[in-house]
Curated annotation (Swiss-Prot):
Belongs to the membrane fusion protein (MFP) (TC 8.A.1) family. The gene is mdtA. Residues 31-56, 391-415 are annotated as: Disordered. Gene3D superfamilies: 2.40.30.170, 2.40.420.20, 2.40.50.100, Helix hairpin bin. This is Multidrug resistance protein MdtA. It comes from the Bacteria. Induction: The mdtABC operon is transcriptionally activated by BaeR. Part of a tripartite efflux system composed of MdtA, MdtB and MdtC. One of its GO terms (cellular component) is plasma membrane. Residues 399-415 have a biased composition (Basic and acidic residues). It is found in: Cell inner membrane. One of its GO terms (molecular function) is efflux transmembrane transporter activity.
Length: 415
């Protein structure tokens, strides 16, 4: 009974101690929470103390670049398609059986190269027949001329009448006309025989064959035997906004050929370089664009017919232009501006007038000068007159590349 009484007292004491500990814990937490607003209020009431606190904090890190003076090319860009300078469907001009093909698919051929042969048997027979008829009529003409000569001698002594002489003269003339017709028939038969050998009409690359050896073909077949595309040179047709026409015309009047570059679909690799050939003679009223044609030598076969490319045409070069990274140019309510760093790394906002720009750099025509440092990263943390810390951009080079660079630097120092 006595042990049970002691146990209850022990439990009561433990509970009391726990309650006291909990009370002190919550009391301390409330005191700390009430102290924070007071500190904030004190800071707000003491501007000088706030500025001292800011100075004690870390400076905003930014990245910067120096405005440089350089020549900047001006490009006009558009989307275009590569087209063959000439595309020819090779068809047979005579009817007959296809006996042979003398090309490999994809082969480069020259004008006049033999491509295919049609069975020439019927054309040889027709030629021989025409030649035989010509020979026969020539013999007839020779005999008629001899008779005419005799008639002319006899007419002098009145042994033949004038009517007989005229009739013989007409026979000679008629036979001469027949000879001309025979000669035309021989030429036609010879031409048919020549056409049985089908040759390339232009230089270019042959495509896939459209018919196999042994088939009967005719001059009316629309598919033809093969298609030749001329790829040396090759053309690029692209479009420009109508607002660019005056710029192109003015550049053409300068007398120098305008350089056109062909870039791949992703605009990351230059495929080839050519020159402007011509502008179309009218604007597309639906799209407000004009077609432009450029020509490329394409000796390396980098361009292929119907290939989609991005076109860039150089129309002008701006000399002594002030250039900064595009990332430094900002837009606000007052217009375009940049943050400029002074010698103490304090920033100030400068309104600028931008010019030519791309994804990497922009020309500044007014507002800053070459040599000025502009902020390119960390701009969202800036205020007028704030002092910042200029840090270098994080390098993506590997340790091995860095070691190689250091080794080259050492070699350069030794040399």
């Amino acid at each position: 009974m006595k042990g049970s009484y002691k146990s209850r007292w022990v439990i009561v004491i433990v509970v009391v101690i726990a309650a006291i500990a909990a009370f002190w814990f919550w009391q301390g937490r409330n005191d700390s929470q009430s102290a924070a607003p007071g500190a904030t209020k004190q800071a707000q009431q003491s501007p000088a103390g706030g500025r001292r606190g800011m100075r004690a904090g870390p400076l905003a890190p930014v990245q910067a670049a120096t405005a440089v003076e350089q020549a900047v090319p001006r490009y006009l860009t558009g989307l275009g398609t590569i087209t063959a300078a000439n595309t020819v469907t090779v068809r047979s001009r005579v009817d007959g059986q296809l006996m042979a093909l003398h090309f490999q698919e994809g082969q480069q051929v020259k004008a006049g190269d033999l491509l295919a042969e049609i069975d020439p048997s019927q054309f040889k027979v027709a030629l021989a027949q025409a030649q035989g008829q010509l020979a026969k009529d020539k013999a007839t003409l020779a005999n008629a001329r001899r008779d005419l000569s005799r008639y002319q001698q006899l007419a002098k002594t009145n042994l033949v009448s004038r009517q007989e002489l005229d009739a013989q003269q007409a026979l000679v003339s008629e036979t001469e006309g027949t000879i001309k017709a025979d000669e035309a028939s021989v030429a036609s038969a010879q031409l048919q025989l020549d056409w049985s050998r089908i040759t390339a009409p232009v230089d270019g690359r042959v495509g896939l064959k459209q018919v196999d050896v042994g088939n009967q073909i005719s001059s009316g077949d629309t598919t033809g035997i093969v298609v030749i595309t001329q790829t040396h040179p090759i053309d690029l047709v692209f479009t420009l906004p109508e607002s660019d026409i005056a710029t192109v015309v003015q550049a053409q009047k300068a007398g120098k050929p305008l350089v056109v570059e062909a870039w791949d679909r992703t605009n990351s690799k230059k495929l080839s370089e050519g020159t402007l050939l011509s502008l179309d003679n009218q604007i597309d009223a639906t799209t407000g664009t004009i077609k432009v044609k450029a020509r490329f030598n394409n000796q390396d076969d980098a361009l292929f017919p119907n290939q989609f490319v991005n076109a860039r045409m150089l129309v002008d070069t701006e000399q002594n232009a002030v250039v900064i990274p595009t990332a430094a140019l900002q837009m606000g309510n007052e217009g375009h501006f940049v943050w400029v760093l002074n010698s103490e790394n304090k920033v100030s906002k400068h309104l600028v007038t931008p010019g030519i720009q791309d994804s990497q750099k922009v020309v500044i025509r007014a507002g800053i000068s070459a040599g000025d440092r502009v902020v390119t990263d960390g701009i969202d943390r800036l205020t007028e007159g704030a002092k910042v810390e200029v840090v270098e951009a994080q390098s993506t080079t590997t340790p091995e590349e860095k070691a190689t660079s250091r080794e080259y630097a050492k070699k350069g120092a030794r040399s």
